[in-house]
Amino acid sequence: MTSPASGVPEPADPKARLAELVERLAAADAAYYRDDAPIMDDAAYDALRREAESLRAAHPDLAAALDQVGAAPSGAFGKVRHRLPMLSLDNVFEPADFVEFCASIRRFLGLGAAPLAFVAEPKIDGLSISLTYENRRFVRGATRGDGTEGEDVTENLRTLRELPATLPDDAPDFIEIRGEVYMTKTDFITLNQGQARQFANPRNAAAGSLRQLDPAVTASRRLSLFAYARGAASQAVGETHWDYLAILRRWGFPVNPLAERVSEAGAEPFQRSIGERRAGLDYDIDGVVYKIDDLALQERLGFAGRAPRWAVAWKFPAERALTTLLGIDIQVGRTGALTPRARLDPVNVGGVLVSHATLHNEDEIARKDVRIGDTVELQRAGDVIPQILRALPERRPADSVPFVFPDHCPVCGALAIRPAGEVVRRCTGGLSCPAQVVERLIHFCSRLAFDIEGMGEKTVQEFHGLGWLESPADIFTLRDREAAIAALEGWGEVSARKLIAAIDARRRISLARFIYALGIRRIGEQNAKLLARHYSSYAVWRRQMEEAGVIGSDARLELGSISGIGPSIAEELAGFFAEPHNRDLLDRLVPMLTIEDEVAAAGGALAGKTIVFTGTLESLTRPEAKARAEALGARVTESVSKKTDFVVVGADAGSKAAKAASLGVTVLSEAEFRSLAGLPPG
């Protein structure tokens, strides 16, 4: 008997033959994908694969065997900490926005009207990755993740034929190269033709393909790569970004051929040109990235929050569409805010199927006179949440009525009040409101907080409904319920064990993440980092926050003087710690964790020091001096106190210099600060 699919005679023992084929194919996969040393050519591999598939089709009882073919799955992806953070970019949408971006660079550097030179590159709509080479060999690849820590996808990246396995002898001993993994439109169409469940767009397809547990699946998806940025390196590579791209090309990396050097005045024409060519490209782009070309200027500009000061993404005009508003749902957030969300008849906007949009607040609904049943114009710009631009009154149903915003919480029924001067209405139910409890728990487990795998919205809601989760501390007692979790529908012992392991893996956390995870109003990721950097340890932070509850106390004044915090945020923090139930939560939670101290940048004279700048500096702008000090591990505050280590004085220093002298605080000249900061004489 001959197998019709493969043309190979039916073996006497199909099970034994299939086992042999599985073993040979697995060895070939491992050699090709992991060792970069193929042991058979493509034709031989394909013939064995076809024979194995034919045997499986003829013998359904053996169907599971071939599923093992491929390099051994990596299991859950490990975590990789980036030596230099992989940050996102700020966006601009109009020429005036770009002009202001350029002006902000000049202000920061004190450049006056000096012209700026950029490198412009199409912004690929894919998945950002970091490629690490040690001793000129590719050793590790990671996704961006939260910018600080990503997922280890090394074995999957090895399957990209465009990725150099080694670098030339002139490359540094250590270097991180950043780039974008994407899928061409052609390959996306081909992939979807063979998929039972289709991907919505090439970006989703690329992300899903790179995160396959089996590298063989990734290899079959035909992913592509563009390299475009630098991470950490043991030595400098080029003096300009344009030089760097040329070096990457010489090393064998694919670099976008549409990248160009442009002047400040040339940015707008280049933006128009790429926009006109966009539809004809075989890959999706959603704008153009403009980077300061001079790497020395990039170094001086540094970073602000989650984005570099030296680069910006100029996004293409927002995509728009018309659809029907089916309903307005009121969501209750972790701080009690009632937020309206539009429920829409699903519509494709820029390649993404949109079924919900933001309505911001009750004033916005009234201003736009948006009503249920209206035909509305929807806009989606880049990664921004879709929003309703306007309603079309001429298409409005005859029985339509204005939307009435609720004055009671839709979840717990408590009164929802709107404080004077605020646009948000808030539920007064506090911790008695199930929605607030659930949202706080979801926030606690989220990616930028404790990042607990498996503790998503659905799981949190289920466990809260069972009475297992009322506060974050309860998460770390779920080990006692492992058997009960395993018994739940859709779980089982393996899933329960993985969840408990994921929770245990997050018992150690940085101070900044811990502060953010608490969900204190107005304490986002950046403010949490500011607080962690300033107070260094959990014990000090908590003690100071409790003391800051007394208006006029040294602790309150110090908190309000932290650059970026200010009095209003200080009031929110003091209010949080004034609540007994919040202190009780911390008393339960903290003993179950290891909260890492914030480690100041090592080795410098400014590390861990508190600095105040006053007066006009000559060789540095105030923002540049502040950024330099913070990059070296210093804490910059606005007012002088006994805890201040240095006051840096410029011209017309005023009262702060006098107060420093009266308190015995060290006063530094600008030249002395430059020396401590490792800068050459100005």
Curated annotation (Swiss-Prot):
One of its GO terms (molecular function) is DNA ligase (NAD+) activity. GO terms for biological process: DNA repair; DNA replication. It catalyses: NAD(+) + (deoxyribonucleotide)n-3'-hydroxyl + 5'-phospho-(deoxyribonucleotide)m = (deoxyribonucleotide)n+m + AMP + beta-nicotinamide D-nucleotide. It is an enzyme of class 6 (ligase). The keyword NAD applies. NAD(+) binds at residues 42-46, 88-89, 121, 144, 180, 291, 315. Transmembrane segments: none annotated. Residues 601-682 form the BRCT domain. The active site is at residue 123. One of its GO terms (cellular component) is cytosol. Its EC number is 6.5.1.2. PROSITE patterns: BRCT, DNA_LIGASE_N1. Its cofactor is Mg(2+); Mn(2+). It comes from the Bacteria. It holds the Pfam family DNA_ligase_OB. SUPFAM superfamilies: BRCT domain, DNA ligase/mRNA capping enzyme, catalytic domain, Nucleic acid-binding proteins, RuvA domain 2-like. Zn(2+) binds at residues 409, 412, 427, 433. Keywords: DNA damage, DNA repair, DNA replication, Ligase, Magnesium, Manganese, Metal-binding, NAD, Zinc. Belongs to the NAD-dependent DNA ligase family. LigA subfamily. DNA ligase that catalyzes the formation of phosphodiester linkages between 5'-phosphoryl and 3'-hydroxyl groups in double-stranded DNA using NAD as a coenzyme and as the energy source for the reaction. It is essential for DNA replication and repair of damaged DNA. This is DNA ligase. It comes from Acidiphilium cryptum (strain JF-5). The lineage of its organism: Bacteria, Pseudomonadati, Pseudomonadota, Alphaproteobacteria, Acetobacterales.
